[in-house]
Curated annotation (Swiss-Prot):
PANTHER family: HOMEOBOX-LEUCINE ZIPPER PROTEIN MERISTEM L1 (PTHR45654), HOMEOBOX-LEUCINE ZIPPER PROTEIN ROC6 (PTHR45654:SF111)
Biased composition (Gly residues): 74-85
Protein name in the entry: Homeobox-leucine zipper protein ROC6
Gene Ontology CC entries for this record: nucleus
Keywords: Coiled coil, DNA-binding, Homeobox, Nucleus, Transcription, Transcription regulation
Length: 872
């Protein structure tokens, strides 16, 4: 960096060589400028040494002239004696104190005597210390920069030097170190001053673009340009050229052009090395050396103000940085949730380390990932993992267990569209409605570079759910980092920041309520690579630690298997949602769809079904998205039976209530939610799903069917699987109330689980929706079923819940089509309006009625499937 000749020729000093040997051996050092010894002045003061960066190398004669000139500047020294004595002593001390570089060689006694009658007639000869002498002196200096007289005598004897030479060598060596520190400090101050000048120039430039009159507020007419403004323009042009050169160097380092308009990083980070990214030889990609310094250089606007993403504001002002120019002290910290300060460099280092780990874990096979013998899930070899990677989120809290899964597949979505959905919290929730209960962006560390999402880092808060009241919600606060590694190749990684935000807490999550489960995300995310025809190959990795004791024992095998919130569920949900979006955007109708519905009506009906499913999931998991008031757990009658029921023969039902007042899309009054989960050992999830979505067998269990089959009026496909659809059902009952009622039903299924959600709607409202009307004001209360595998493998031993509840390890599952330990976990949830008055009080009779209805429905399903039931 040029400083415009600020230091050229400034100051004075003694120029010496910190080197040894004329042969250029290992002991040769670059020449340095040493400050002159203090020069006496008449007033007894001393001149401060100067600083010069521009002196050229001088030969011995020139050094002698300089020494003589310096000595002649004195005026008698500190003792008595004249100019001659002072000159002699100055020359002698300087000759003896040459930093191990110049030494007297073979000089006679007369030559060394300062009182010689003609000392200037004979030219003194000098030589350098040998490399061995310098090496020995340097070694001692590292151990003891201030040796005492005894140590100096020992060194002089061992190195064949005079004690005075050793003494002066150490003095000069200490002076060199001090001078280096001073230079570094001055350079740092100059860099800060340079940044301030840049900021001032930017302010002046903005003011010159739109000059305003201070008195009238109108446009000001520029007069004659002053001399000061001309200097500012010249300085501004010079700074711009310098910035362009820096951007060009950064572009060469990163392999992509860097705009000079981007705000520069803070001065302390300008010297950091860049992040090395490249395409790997195996078709994947790899990362070079990573660290916080790499992040600063590779993301130019990383330390700028907290600009928001397109499409929505940033959620919490508490985590927002003050907007401003990068490099200000305030831009280096974000406020923590508890009011503390977080160094952004720590967050950047965490994000980069997580990205490095995700890329490697997604690429590596054996011995890191061990294939299962039955062709199922891969297993992470934790011994190999701990050898290969350092922990990025601290030690695992006591009582937590780990889950690690990996899955790959093809999705009908481009890499850019998927990345945009993941980096936008509302779109992310819509993409995974059954997994993400709620999500928000707390802070934007970086909005990306070059107008893309590459380099974007966000601090996010999310609630992850398993559709059952027996599994608390996982609340996580994490960093999401997106990076483009090559053309059409992206990676998005999540990593918990609990250890940074709350270092005094061992557990993850931000709530101590029993409705939440402690959880920490280790590097988790996906690798997306574009393929032909709008498809992408997606590799999903989930690595988490959670408090298993918070979940009921019925669901612990499912959680341990990684099927509850593992990579397979994320990828399967993504594939199903992408198929739905592709059909929604298509102009052609699937073969199974009814042609009577217009395209606008189809979209309106699908939007209504999506709202119904979202409300169902929020009611099952008691997410904070809906304000439910939890009641005491009820015991329904007749939930068990068949030899496989719970220990007391009753179902444990979670009851919640809320008052709906003027909410669009909901009937006013008191809404009661009843939810329970049971296990059907030996009954496959697909069999349960096919039975529940069959309108011909609806009368077996649905009280709305009045014991009869239903007729499908309309059908809208949502995917390639015939089980992914939205249907409009009509009861075959003859009563007036039934004739005015229809059933809106949405069914979803994939390899991770299935969902059947339905709600009664009136005929007039559905006619409006099917003709393209707004569905936001259609009132409905959803009910339905969430079906998941139970997580038991063939031949596995029964869980403690089975043994404790009276289940027999050898009991057969009638009609289950599988072994005893392969079954389903079914969650049943009803939302019922128990009173039309929002101010009415909830009665015990209403709660008992809904609880008994839930238990009766489970009993009917059990009888129809000829299955045994294990209740919590």
């Amino acid at each position: 960096m040029s400083f415009g000749g600020m230091f050229d020729g400034a100051g004075s000093g003694v120029f010496s060589y910190d080197a040894g040997g004329g042969g250029g051996g290992g002991g040769v050092h670059n020449s340095r400028l040493l400050p002159t010894p203090p020069v006496p002045k008449p007033g007894g003061g001393f001149a401060a040494p100067g600083l010069s960066l521009g002196l050229q190398t001088m030969d011995g004669s020139q050094l002698g002239d300089v020494n003589r000139s310096l000595a002649m500047m004195g005026n008698g020294g500190s003792g008595s004696g004249g100019d001659g004595d002072s000159l002699g002593r100055g020359r002698e001390e300087e000759n003896d104190s040459r930093s191990g570089s110049d030494n007297l060689d073979g000089a006679s006694g007369d030559e060394l005597d300062p009182d010689n009658s003609n000392p200037r007639k004979k030219k003194k000869r000098y030589h350098r210390h040998t490399p061995q002498q310098i090496q020995e002196l340097e070694a001692v200096f590292k151990e003891c920069p201030h040796p005492d007289e005894k140590q100096r005598m020992e060194l002089s004897r061992r190195l064949n030097l005079e004690s005075r030479q050793v003494k002066f060598w150490f003095q000069n060596r200490r002076t060199q170190m001090k001078q280096t520190q001073i230079e570094r400090h001055e350079n740092a101050l100059l860099r800060q001053e340079n940044d301030k000048l840049r900021a001032e120039n930017m302010t002046i430039r903005e003011a010159m673009r739109n000059p305003m009159c201070a008195s009238c507020g109108g446009a000001a007419v520029l007069g004659e340009v002053s001399l000061e403004e001309q200097h500012l323009r010249i300085e501004n042009a010079r700074l711009k050229d310098e910035l362009d050169r820096v951007c060009a160097l950064a572009g060469k380092f990163l392999g992509r052009p860097i705009s000079s308009i981007s705000s520069p990083g803070p001065p302390s980070l300008q010297a950091c090395s860049g992040l090395e990214l490249g395409v790997g030889s195996n078709g994947g990609f790899g990362l070079g050396a990573l660290g916080a310094s790499a992040a600063m250089q590779s993301i130019p606007d990383l330390m700028g103000g907290s600009s928001g993403l397109t499409g929505g504001p940033v959620g919490s002002a508490a985590m927002r940085l003050p907007a401003g120019i990068g490099g200000l002290d305030g831009a280096m910290h974000a406020a923590a949730a508890d009011g503390g300060a977080i160094d952004r460099a720590v967050l950047l280092e965490l994000a980069l380390a997580a990205m490095d780990e995700l890329v490697k874990v997604a690429q590596m096979d054996e011995p890191l990932w061990l294939p299962s013998l039955d062709g199922g899930f891969e297993t992470l070899n934790y011994d190999e993992y701990h050898r290969a990677f350092a922990r990025v989120v601290g030690q695992c809290p006591a009582g937590y267990v780990s889950e690690a899964t990996r899955e790959s597949g093809i999705a009908i979505i481009s890499s850019v569209d998927l990345v945009d959905s993941l980096m936008d919290a509302p779109r992310w929730s819509e993409m995974f409605p059954c997994v993400v209960a709620r999500a928000s962006t707390t802070d934007i560390i970086s909005s990306g570079m070059g107008g893309t999402r590459s380099g974007s880092i966000q601090l996010m808060h999310a609630e992850l759910q398993v559709l059952s009241p027996l599994v608390p919600i996982r609340e996580v606060v994490f960093l999401r980092f997106c990076k483009q590694h090559a053309e059409g190749l992206w990676a998005v990684v999540d990593v918990s920041v609990d250890a940074v935000l709350r270092p005094d807490q061992n557990g993850g999550g931000g709530s101590s309520s029993s409705s939440y489960m402690g959880c920490r995300l280790l590097p988790t995310g996906c690798i997306v690579q574009d393929m032909n025809n709008g498809y992408s190959k997606v590799t999903w990795v989930v690595h988490a630690e959670y408090d298993e004791t918070a979940a009921h024992q019925l669901y612990r095998p499912l959680l341990r298997s990684g099927q509850a919130l593992g990579a397979r569920r994320w990828l399967a949900s993504l594939q199903r949602q992408c198929q739905y979006l592709a059909i929604l955007c298509s102009n052609s109708l699937p073969a199974r769809d009814h042609a009577a519905i217009t395209p606008v009506g189809r979209r309106s009906m699908l939007k209504l079904a999506q709202r119904m499913t979202d409300n169902f999931c929020a009611g099952v998991c008691a997410s904070a998205a809906q304000k439910w008031r939890r009641l005491d757990e009820w015991r329904g009658e007749g939930g068990g039976g068949g030899g496989g029921g719970g220990g007391d023969g009753e179902d444990k039902v979670r009851m919640m209530a809320r008052h709906s007042v003027g909410a669009p899309g909901e009937p006013p009054g008191v809404v009661l939610s009843a939810t329970t989960s049971v296990r059907l050992p030996g009954t496959l999830p697909q069999r349960v799903f096919d039975y529940l979505r069959d309108e011909q067998r609806r009368g077996d269990w649905d009280i709305l069917a009045n014991g009869e089959a239903m007729q499908e009026m309309d059908h809208i496909a949502k995917g390639q699987h015939h089980g992914n659809a939205v249907s409009l059902l009509r009861p075959n009952a003859t009563s007036g109330n039934q004739n005015n009622m229809l059933i809106l039903q949405e069914t979803c299924t994939d390899s991770s689980g299935s969902l059947v959600v339905y709600a009664p709607v009136d005929v007039q409202s559905m006619h409006v929706v099917m003709n393209g009307g707004d569905s936001a004001y259609v009132s409905l209360l959803p009910s339905g079923f969430a079906i998941l595998p139970d997580g038991h493998n063939n031949g596995a031993s029964p869980s403690p819940a089975e043994v404790g509840s009276g289940a027999s390890p050898n009991s057969a599952a009638g009609g289950g089509g599988g072994s005893n330990n392969t079954g389903s976990l079914v969650t049943v949830a009803f939302q019922i309006l128990v009173n039309n008055l929002p101010t009415a009080k909830l009665t015990v009779e209403s709660v008992d009625t809904v609880s008994n209805l839930l238990s009766c429905t489970i009993q009917k399903i059990k009888s129809a499937l000829q299955a045994s039931i294990i209740s919590p």
